[in-house]
A protein has these predicted regions:
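Residue-level signal for well-ordered alpha-helical positions
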Residues: 19, 49, 94-95
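Enriched for short, Lys/Arg-rich terminal
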Residues: 72-102
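A short, surface-exposed loop/turn module that caps and links secondary-structure elements
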Residues: 44-73
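A generic structural signal for secondary-structure junctions
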Residues: 24, 51, 96-99
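Arg/Lys-rich, positively charged N-terminal/basic patches that mediate binding to nucleic acids
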Residues: 1-42
């Protein structure tokens, strides 16, 4: 199994900041930070598990990147969309699982 270096795209950073801002409005500050840290850990885990995920067949996900793969978060609320280039796993977007059409 190969290990990749994870890079977070600008669009994914914006998505993450929007999610974190939303969490601050809904949860207490400590709970929101704990949730955000869990999401960061999941993103870091892509470095190890990137090869385990097959290319997506969803047209919506493929419109983001033609070689896109997806990883669903631990609570199945978020979808991390990424692709692999050379030694890098590049996270393209973080979307709500409810918005992904099959």
């Amino acid at each position: 199994m190969r290990e990749y270096r994870v890079i977070i795209n600008r669009a994914a950073r914006v998505d993450f900041l929007e999610i974190r801002t939303f969490l601050w409005g809904v949860l207490s500050f400590q709970s929101a930070e704990k949730y955000a840290n869990a999401m960061r850990a999941e993103i870091k885990s892509i470095s190890i598990f990137a090869d385990c995920f097959q290319r997506s067949t969803s047209k919506q996900i493929l419109s983001i990147h033609p070689q896109a793969r997806r990883m669903v978060s631990h609570n199945k609320r978020w979808v991390y969309i990424f692709h692999i280039e050379d030694d890098f796993a590049i996270v393209d977007r973080i979307l709500s699982a409810k918005n992904i059409k099959q």
